[in-house]
A protein has these predicted regions:
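Helical element adjacent to the flavin cofactor pocket in flavoenzyme catalytic cores
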Residues: 97-109
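Beta1/beta-strand and adjacent pyrophosphate-binding region of the FAD-binding site
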Residues: 9-26
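Glycine-rich FAD pyrophosphate-binding loop
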Residues: 19-21, 35-61
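Glycine-rich active-site loop/strand segments that organize a redox cofactor
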Residues: 48, 53-99
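Short polybasic/polar patches that bind polyanions
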Residues: 35, 74, 105
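Generic structural signal for beta-strand residues in well-ordered domains
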Residues: 11-13, 34, 47, 68
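N-terminal acidic, proline/glycine-rich, low-complexity intrinsically disordered segments
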Residues: 1-6
Length: 109
């Protein structure tokens, strides 16, 4: 697991009181930031895997088989975790799902 910074005094006040709902892009970003601050949290996801609506296997997903990102991967990727070079500039939903899975696995989320 990557090293985390010591929690700031304000963050320490929140220890044990954070419920993180969803493991889509926003939930993963929030989880990573809490992790970097050293703030423990409990995550909740309705589906069995990460990716949120980008996970076509999620029964609640509204993504369709031919869906692609409409913005470049370079403006969408997490700053500290670039998308693989072989991923197209406008990734498919399957590439996005894999990216979110790899991000979660890499940071132990």
């Amino acid at each position: 697991m990557p090293e985390t910074s010591p929690a700031t005094p304000a963050a320490q006040d929140l220890r044990g009181h954070i419920a993180l709902i969803g493991a889509g892009p926003s939930g993963l970003a929030a989880a990573r930031n809490l992790q970097k601050l050293g703030v423990p949290f409990q995550g909740f996801e309705a589906h069995t895997d990460v990716g949120g609506l980008w996970n076509i296997d999620n029964p609640r997903s509204t993504v369709y088989e031919s869906a692609h990102l409409i913005s470049s991967k370079h403006t969408t990727e997490f700053t500290e975790f670039p998308m693989r070079p072989e991923v197209a500039d406008y990734p498919s939903h399957r590439d996005m799902r894999q990216y979110f899975f790899d991000f979660a696995e890499h940071f132990g989320l």
